[in-house]
Amino acid sequence: MSTPSAPANPKVGFVSLGCPKALVDSERILTQLRMEGYDVVSTYQDADVVVVNTCGFIDSAKAESLEVIGEAIKENGKVIVTGCMGVEEGNIRDVHPSVLAVTGPQQYEQVVNAVHEVVPPKQDHNPLIDLVPPQGIKLTPRHYAYLKISEGCNHSCSFCIIPSMRGKLVSRPVGDVLDEAQRLVKSGVKELLVISQDTSAYGVDVKYRTGFWNGAPVKTRMTELCEALSTLGVWVRLHYVYPYPHVDELIPLMAAGKILPYLDIPFQHASPKVLKAMKRPAFEDKTLARIKNWREICPELIIRSTFIVGFPGETEEDFQYLLNWLTEAQLDRVGCFQYSPVEGAPANDLDLEVVPDEVKQDRWERFMAHQQEISSARLQQRIGKEIEVLIDEVDENGAVGRCFFDAPEIDGNVFIDGAGDLKPGDKVWCRVTDADEYDLWAETL
């Protein structure tokens, strides 16, 4: 007599949109579902239910989220929505009334419960038999991972609605962060990308209280966290660093090789008038002097930043001020966005002249051309120098990787001719042979 086959595990499809912080949220939800016996599938057709983790930061991101929700409904029919756009449930249901549930960001339990209601977990599921790794389910390649250290933000930048979506700053216990980092490294991660809405504010909400890791006291504070992370023997890269005065403390750690000499600081603009309208504190800051001082302490320092052009009230004089500032600052990696009104943002109520779309486009093009010249000149200086490269991809044409001044997805690449025995996750020393405004070409030593 044949033994009846066990019922199949329930299957979940998942779409993750938006920033690395949202990606970490997706990883947490998927880890919980996997521990409960759900299989994660890669097609709409194979899924019993689809979860869409949305982005709601700007209008174009909302449009993409609504488009993906519609695609999931068309291809599957059973869709649960979560993430930053989830705070606008009415707007989502106006366009897609058939979605089964809508939750906001960080509402992990509500998402999992919504999945339970659509397709319950198997009653006889034994979580001990699931091969969920200690570091959880990761959506990044095996050799790098995002390490989220806090949620929310205490700032009130006039163009931003993150505090209304994700709340005020809540720092994770320092011991938990370091335990997670250690698990990731043990699993094969070679690069930790430290993220949050405001990385340098870590611990402010708990008054930098002392926690414990491996039996030793560690302050819940950015500098001490970086010191501890540096003992793990992997690349540590800092993102979303607000330019607080205590950021100066991180530069000696970079100069000493404890963490990567890479700072991702979203300056947003340079004109004091525009920064004041944005409610950014840097309008009181001698930012150029600080950058000069940082580079004196750590000559290899790479600075990445993002800027907004076309903010309400921005004049041609303000824009020229920004271009001149870029010339002096000599930033290495730069992104630029045209200002887009965000529903609920205080900037919508500013009594300032709106910059026409065609002017925004013109300024964006001029900004990008100006910065490309700067970036290209800085990368040309790398030709002939030796760099350590972390390999991301290998194919028949060679290998593609990154060095210390390249974060994944947002920065450039290092192209290596001929892969040899290289594989993703390997580190290899190379000599730079060529460069353009974004990328390097190199040969192995």
From Swiss-Prot:
Protein species of origin: Pseudomonas fluorescens (strain ATCC BAA-477 / NRRL B-23932 / Pf-5)
Q: What is the lineage of its organism?
A: Bacteria, Pseudomonadati, Pseudomonadota, Gammaproteobacteria, Pseudomonadales
Which branch of life, at top level? Bacteria
Identify the residues that the record assigns to the MTTase N-terminal domain, covering every copy: 10-120
- Ribonucleoprotein: is it a keyword of this entry? no
Q: How is the cofactor bound?
A: Binds 2 [4Fe-4S] clusters. One cluster is coordinated with 3 cysteines and an exchangeable S-adenosyl-L-methionine.
* Enzyme Commission number(s) from the entry: 2.8.4.4
Query: Which cysteine pairs are joined by S-S bonds?
Result: none
Cofactor needs: [4Fe-4S] cluster
UniProt-annotated binding residues for [4Fe-4S] cluster 2? C153, C157, C160
Positions with a binding annotation for [4Fe-4S] cluster 1: C19, C55, C84
User: What is the protein's known function?
Assistant: Catalyzes the methylthiolation of an aspartic acid residue of ribosomal protein uS12.
The catalysed reaction is: L-aspartate(89)-[ribosomal protein uS12]-hydrogen + (sulfur carrier)-SH + AH2 + 2 S-adenosyl-L-methionine = 3-methylsulfanyl-L-aspartate(89)-[ribosomal protein uS12]-hydrogen + (sulfur carrier)-H + 5'-deoxyadenosine + L-methionine + A + S-adenosyl-L-homocysteine + 2 H(+)
Q: Which Pfam families match?
A: Radical_SAM, TRAM_2, UPF0004
Name it: Ribosomal protein uS12 methylthiotransferase RimO
PROSITE patterns for the chain: MTTASE_N, MTTASE_RADICAL, RADICAL_SAM, TRAM
Question: Which SMART domains does the entry link to?
Answer: Elp3 (SM00729)
